[in-house]
Each structure stands twice: as structure tokens, then as C-alpha cells.
Amino acid sequence: AFRQQAWTALLAHRPNVIRANASEVMALTGLASQGRGVDATTTTEDAAQAAIKLAQQQCCIVAMTGETDLITNGTHHYRLTGGHALMPRVTTLGCGLSALVAGFLAANQAHPLSATLAALACFSIAGSRAGQQASGPGSFQVALLDALYALTPDDLSSLSQLETLHAV
């Protein structure tokens, strides 16, 4: 109940981007989910239509993250793959990604969809690189920070994990 009240209050401010996992997107649209609280057992594919509906209802971008990310403004839809299997095992990575999205939005206010895509792509690339270095969740967290620090613009230009979806 508290979480739903908090979401309602936040949505009243008309955010430019909603960054959430699939279970959270399902809850925001009032659809049943297989997750409870932060348990993200609903897959991105299961919640794709809910994300599009939420983006259309709120006139914003929805960045639904999970094993596969779906980014939509209600009209244009993108799928991003990458990252690493350790990412869901590290607490606060979703919050960190939300902060990264906010930073990218602040730097590129005129193009919020591009800013959101770039933020998620950076996180995905850094997660993949961190996973190659880490031996577990603790070392992954540190390796992720180092990988984010080491990213260059060229790293984004070679991104092949981003797919434009014509229908979801």
C-alpha cells in the first residue's frame, strides 16, 4: 500500500522517465504480476505491453530493466541486451541506474529518449565488462564503478546490443 501511494504521488509530478523492473511496471499499470515488492519475477517480455501503455498514459519514457531492457516512449520501442548475470544479485544497482539516467537527462534535456538509451547502454556495457573481472557480487560492484569510469564515447558507437522494435 505504501509503495503504491508513493508511486501515485511521484506520477503526479509527470516524470520524463520511469525506470522500473517488469514487476514494478505491471504494478504501476494495475496488472497482476508474479513478483511481490522488489521480487522481479515478471520478465520484460511479459510486461512489454504494460510498459507501452504506461508510457502512453503518462506521456513519458519507460525504461523497463531486467535481463533484457525495453525502452519506449509509447510510440518508439527499443530492446537492449547485455549486462551480466551478477547484476540482479547486487542490491541498489537499479537505484544507481536511475541516478545515471537522471544525469544523462540533465545533460541532454532536449532528447530524453536518446539520453535514456545512452544511460542504459553505458550501464549494460559496464556491467558486461565488470562481470569479466568479478568473482562475485561484492567485487562486481567495485568493478562496475571502475567500468563506468573507464567508458569512452567510442564504447557507445560500437554498441550492437540495441535493437529497434517495430512491434511489441
Residue ranges of model-derived segments:
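Charged C-terminal helix
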Residues: 125-168
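Short, well-structured alpha-helical segments that form the helix of a local strand-helix-strand
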Residues: 50-55, 112-127, 144-145
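N-terminal glycine-rich phosphate/adenylate-binding segment common to multiple enzyme folds
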Residues: 1
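Glycine-rich phosphate/pyrophosphate-binding loop at beta-loop-alpha junctions
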Residues: 72, 76-82, 117, 122-136, ...
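Conserved phosphate/ATP/ADP-binding segment of small-molecule kinases
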Residues: 4-77
